[in-house]
Amino acid sequence: MVDQGFFTLKKEKKKNILIKLFYVKILGFCFCDSWSSSDMAHSLTSLAVFQSVIRKEMVRSLHVYESVEIEREFWFKSKSCYVEKKAKPLFRSEDFRRPEISEGSVFGTWRCIFVFRFNHSLPRFPTLLCLSRNPKLEDIPNLANELKFISELKPSKIYEEEQCSSSTEGYYNSDLPKPRKLVLKQDLNCLPDSETESEESVNEKTEHSEFENDKTEQSESDAKTEILKKKKRTPSRHVAELSLEELSKYFDLTIVEASRNLKVGLTVLKKKCREFGIPRWPHRKIKSLDCLIHDLQREAEKQQEKNEAAAMAVAKKQEKLETEKRNIVKRPFMEIGIETKKFRQENFKKRHRASRAKKNQESLVTSSST
């Protein structure tokens, strides 16, 4: 008797729900006083939300409760509360087909931004319809309660049927015998009768592959040791102890050669130069001064035989250049003087003229000999 009473109660509840849904269908927009939006959400089978392409603040929603379809329109005001408006049926017309609804699809001036179907994978909520990000949705409970109901659904409930179907398929497939893979044991390069020859060739191939693997392993180990050697950094104490006097010993060399002799990395040496206020390694300045001094020495030797006064003037120039070189070694941030730059340019022109004259003489000699 208890069971029968229980079933009769269930039937009565179902009848009440159907009656209320019938009233909802007739009224279209308004709900009965006894029927709350939260109760309605539990019977929701699908929901589609559309946004106007022309007016972004206008939003429409199509709610399907078992066999009843309700269409609503909302006004998403930016500066004030959201409002629900009376909606004329637009998506419930005979021309409109429900299966065609998908996220991103456009129907006239309305674009679909959200689609939910029961027993389907949960959709992604846009920021406009996300309750945590958009608290104004609470102003329109008819939409907010249903969005809350969808967000609270667990994926396990929705995927239950899909998982069952996949598991049953897997179970039935496991009973079936797996197809065997065909493997050719015969070497295609040899005749079918010559089994011994094919075995020998296989052995040779395996030995060759093992030898190659050993080679690759050795090369990899060598590369690792080289990397480890390169990665060894100079101790910080050695770098800190480097003074300007030590650096000045190698100013006549290039910066790369100097870093090798000092047993310091190139970047470390450059950093040290910046600390001492050296913007550029003074190798070129000192080299150019050395060349000029060497040229003046030659001139002085020549002038001593002809004219002593000219030789004395050359010697004075030489002394000036030597003092300038010493100053640059002491203070490498110094630039070469204007007079020395002019003298360097003149010296370069002299050399160039001499080399051209020499070439012309050689060409004349060759032409006369022919």
Curated annotation (Swiss-Prot):
Q: Name one GO biological process term.
A: regulation of DNA-templated transcription
Classify the main location: nucleus
Q: Which residues form the RWP-RK domain?
A: 224-309
Region span, Disordered: 193-232, 347-370
GO cellular component term of the entry, any: nucleus
Q: Which organism is it from?
A: Arabidopsis thaliana (Mouse-ear cress)
Q: Where in the cell is it found?
A: Nucleus
Give the protein's biological function: Putative transcription factor.
A Gene Ontology molecular function term of the record: DNA-binding transcription factor activity
Record keywords: Coiled coil, DNA-binding, Nucleus, Transcription, Transcription regulation
Q: Which domain of life is it from?
A: Eukaryota
| Composition skew (Basic residues), residue ranges | 349-358
Protein name per the record: Protein RKD5
Coiled coil regions, renumbered to chain: 283-328
* Basic and acidic residues composition-biased segments: 202-228
